[in-house]
């Protein structure tokens, strides 16, 4: 029965904790949107090269 007040206090402390990460960002903390943007840029570049290779003979980087 003595554990119940301690448990309630711990629950109140957890609930009142900040909802964000208080650690400073490092170089390794890259947002997921950055990876998504890189993927879109790569796909767009590959599609542009493919369309260029179909239309113009001297445009294709690999011949």
From Swiss-Prot:
Keywords: Amidation, Cleavage on pair of basic residues, Disulfide bond, Neurotoxin, Secreted, Signal, Toxin. Residues 20-49 form a propeptide. Expressed by the venom duct. It comes from the Eukaryota. The modification Tryptophan amide is found at residue 62. One of its GO terms (cellular component) is extracellular region. The keyword Cell membrane does not apply. GO terms for molecular function: toxin activity. It is found in: Secreted. Belongs to the conotoxin T superfamily. This is Conotoxin PnMRCL-0111. It comes from Conus pennaceus (Feathered cone). The lineage of its organism: Eukaryota, Metazoa, Spiralia, Lophotrochozoa, Mollusca.
